[in-house]
Amino acid sequence: MKRTIKYLSFLGLIPFLSITTISCVKQAKENNNKNQLISQFKQLIFILNSFDLDNKKLESKIIKAIEKSDFNKISNINLELTIKFLTRIKNELETKTISQLNKNDKLDILTKIKVHLGSLNLIELVNIVDELVNKLNQKEEIKNTHKDKIEKNKDNIEDIDDSKLEILESKYIPNQHNYPDYVKNFKTVSAEEIYKELYDRTFSIKFLVKLKDGGLLSNGTGTGWLLDYHKYSNTNKYKMFIATNLHVLADFSNSLTDEQNKEFNYYDPSGNKVIGLGLGKADNVTDFSRKNNNSKSENNIANYYLNNQDFENYLKNDFWSVNKFSKGISEPKIVFGAVDFMKDRAIKNHYEALQKEAINYYNYKKNNNEINDDNKIAWNNFLNNKDIPIMIDFAVFEFDVDLDLVDYNLKSWISNAISGLDNYLDRLNKAPILPNQDKKISKYLQTTDYVSALFKKDKSEQNLYNAKDIYIAGYPTSQYSRSVWMQNNPIERNSSTLTSNWRSPTNDKTFAFANEVEEKAGTGLNFNIHDNYWHRVFATFYGYQYNINFSSLYYGASGSLAYNEFGQMIGIYNNVKSNVEFGDLLQSATIAPFLQSDNIKVGDNIIYAYNLIDGTDKTKYKYQKSSFRENLQKLYPNGFSDGLKSTKLFDDIFN
C-alpha cells in the first residue's frame, strides 16, 4: 500500500512538472529574445558616432551605459518599438552622410532618440545624447562666430592673394651636426665676450600689481634685457625698452589707457593694474668662463631697485635679496606683446581648431574642479566673446630712468646696459660679413632665420640653417628663491666622451641647434591653450621654436637673450623640461626666434612670415599687423615727449 501511494504520489507530480518545464522554456525564450533586443541597442554606437566622429571614447561610453542599464523593467514590446526606430535611423544614415544634414535635422534626430530612450528610463544613454546635443550647439556657435569674424574683417582677409607670395615647402631633414664649407667666411666671437655683453644687457625683473580689490601682488621673477632705448634731448634721462617672455608678463595688466589696451588686444578683464617694477642684477660679475654642470653656485645673487615705496613695503620680509626704492625709475608700460599680432587672414584656417581645443580644455578643467577664481575670469571672457588670440612668447615693456635721480650703482647698471647694446651694434657694423644677415636691410638682426634657410634652395653661401654654439644667460631662481646669474654651456658641453642627448654624437661634436624645431600652426594644429596670461585665454604658438642643447637654465631665466657664436641675437629663451633641476645645464630647452623671413607651407597650412621687432615691410610681412616698431608708431604718433622720433635701433621710428 505504501508503495502504491508512493507511485500515485509520483504520478500526481507529473502534470505539475510538465507545467513547470513549459514555463521555464517560455521564460528562456523570453530571456533570449530580450538579450537579442538589448544587443541591437548597440546600433546606437554607429548612430551617435556619426554625430561625433572625433570622440574616440564614445563607443566604450555607450557600451558601459548599456551594461549599466536595467532592461528587465522594460517590456519587450517597448524595446522592439525603440529598436525599430533606431534601425530606421541607422538605415537612413547609411544612405547619406551626416554632412548632408543641417543642424535642425541633426537636432531633430537626436531629440527623437532622447525621447525614446527617456521613455524607457535609460538615463545613462539619455545623458550621452544630451552631451552630443550640447556639442552640436557649440560647434554651430563656433561656426557662426567664425563667419561673423570673417565678415567683420572682410577687407583685412581678402586683400592678400597667396598666388602672389613666394612660399617655401617644409620637409623633413635629419638633425645636422656639421656646417657647410663656407662657414669659414664668418668670424666667430669668443664665449667670454658674448657672456659679458649678455650680462651687461640683462636684468632680473619682477612686478607689483594692484588688484581690483585694492590688494597688492608680486608673483615670481623673470629675466629681461635691453632691446632698444631712446635718449631724451638735453637731459640725462632714457626710455629703456626691455624684452622678455610674454609669460613673464602674465600679471603685467592694463598698463596702457583703456582705449590702447583694447586697440592692441592687451586688456585684462580682471581690472588689475601693474604699478611696480623691480629691476635687479648681480653686482660685480667678472668671471664669464665655463663652470662645471650642477655647480649650483649662489654667489651671484640679484638685488633690486624698485620704482615705488609700496613695492618696497611689500617686500620688507624678503630676506634673500636687497630691495631698494629709487625715485629715478618710472612706472612700467607695455609696448608690444606678440599676441594677436597676425592678421585674421593668417589664422582663419586655425579658427575652428582653436575654438574646439579651448572648449575641450575648459571642459576638462571644469570636470576636474580646476577652475579657480583667477582662471574663471579668463574663461568667462572667452565664453562671452569666443576670442582666442595666438601668441609667441615675446614681449617688450618700457620705463623711463633719470640718471640724475639714481644712485651710483643703479646708474652703472643702466650705463653698462646701454654700452652693451652699443657694443653689439658696433661689432655687427664692423663685421665684413655675417651669416643670415643683410646689413642693408637690418643693422641689428638676422634677415633670414634658420628654418627659412633650411627650406630654401639658396646657393648664395650667405645663410646657415644650424648653429654649433648658442649662448644664453639669465637669472634662474635657486632652491632658496634667490635669482642667480647663470650661463648655459657648462664645461661638460665640450666633452669628447660624454653624450648628453641620446640622438646626438658626443657633446663636443653636437650642435646646440641642429635644425630640430617644433611648430603648432601647421600639421595637426595642436595648439597649447593657456588661461593664465592677463586673465585671458590664449593659444601658443605661431611660427617655429628651436630646440637647443646644453641650455637648461632653471625657471626664472625665462626671457633670456640667445646669441649664436657669431655674436648675433637669434631668439628668446622660453621653455625648459619640467624635470630639470636648478644648476643642471646639459638638458635641452627652447627659444622663440625673432623672425620667420619666409612663408612656409606645412601640411595644408601656411605659416606666414613675421618679424617681431620690425614688421613694417609689408612686401615681406603682409600678414603681420603689429610689431615692436609698429606699436611705437601708434603709441608715439608725434614722437617721444622731447619731440624726437629716434631710438638706438631706428633713426626714425616712422621711416
UniProtKB/Swiss-Prot annotation:
InterPro entries given in the database record: Mycoplasma_peptidase_DUF31 (IPR022382), Uncharacterised_MG067 (IPR022381)
Source organism phylogeny: Bacteria, Bacillati, Mycoplasmatota, Mollicutes, Mycoplasmataceae
Membrane topology label: Lipid-anchor
Any one Pfam family match given in the protein's UniProt record, by short name: Mycop_pep_DUF31
Membership in a protein family: Belongs to the MG067/MG068/MG395 family.
Protein's name according to its UniProt entry: Uncharacterized lipoprotein MCAP_0231
Cell membrane as UniProt keyword: yes
Top-level taxon of the source organism: Bacteria
Keywords recorded for this protein, A-Z: Cell membrane, Lipoprotein, Membrane, Palmitate, Signal
Subcellular location: Cell membrane
Lipidated residue numbers (N-palmitoyl cysteine): C24
UniProt cross-references to PROSITE patterns, sorted A to Z: PROKAR_LIPOPROTEIN
Membrane among keywords: yes
Lipidation (S-diacylglycerol cysteine): C24
Organism: Mycoplasma capricolum subsp. capricolum (strain California kid / ATCC 27343 / NCTC 10154)
One GO location term (cellular component): plasma membrane
